[in-house]
Amino acid sequence: MSNIPAELRFAESHEWARLEADGTVTVGISDHAQEALGDVVFVELPEIGKVFAAGDVAGVVESVKAASDIYSPVAGEVVEVNEALGDSPESLNSEPYSAWIFKVKPASAEADLAKLLDAAGYKGAIGE
């Protein structure tokens, strides 16, 4: 059973989003996603300054089993990436909710976040 923090919002494509106090949105992959992927060996991060619409491909997570696209759950500009994933991509397996991938300055955070699933909705979507 996956650990699903109540304070996060989730895309059906298994990314999580957290609205920060400074108005940015932090993005990562869910515990369910990392379990399905297996051991993560590489993360292709988006470029700082890149602008995404909600649902755009923002990067790639590669594991020993497969490569999977990462989608931006909200529209906005990438303002920070987690460079530590270059040296330790496996932290997405061990700490999926603290090992974030990128941060976005959202175009309309409230509207985009409202379209995402809450923890209970995500739990239902993954059959838990």
Curated annotation (Swiss-Prot):
Bound cofactor: record note: Binds 1 lipoyl cofactor covalently.
Cofactor: (R)-lipoate
Keywords: Lipoyl
Functional summary from the UniProt entry: The glycine cleavage system catalyzes the degradation of glycine. The H protein shuttles the methylamine group of glycine from the P protein to the T protein.
Family classification: Belongs to the GcvH family.
Limits of the Lipoyl-binding domain: 24-105
Subunit structure: The glycine cleavage system is composed of four proteins: P, T, L and H.
Protein name: Glycine cleavage system H protein 2
Swiss-Prot/TrEMBL GO biological process terms: glycine decarboxylation via glycine cleavage system
Source organism of this protein record: Pseudomonas syringae pv. tomato (strain ATCC BAA-871 / DC3000)
Organism domain of life: Bacteria
PROSITE patterns tied to this protein: BIOTINYL_LIPOYL, LIPOYL
Cellular component terms per the entry's GO annotation: cytosol; glycine cleavage complex
InterPro entries for this protein: 2-oxoA_DH_lipoyl-BS, Biotin_lipoyl, GCV_H, GCV_H/Fam206, GCV_H_sub, Single_hybrid_motif
Residues recorded with modification N6-lipoyllysine: 65
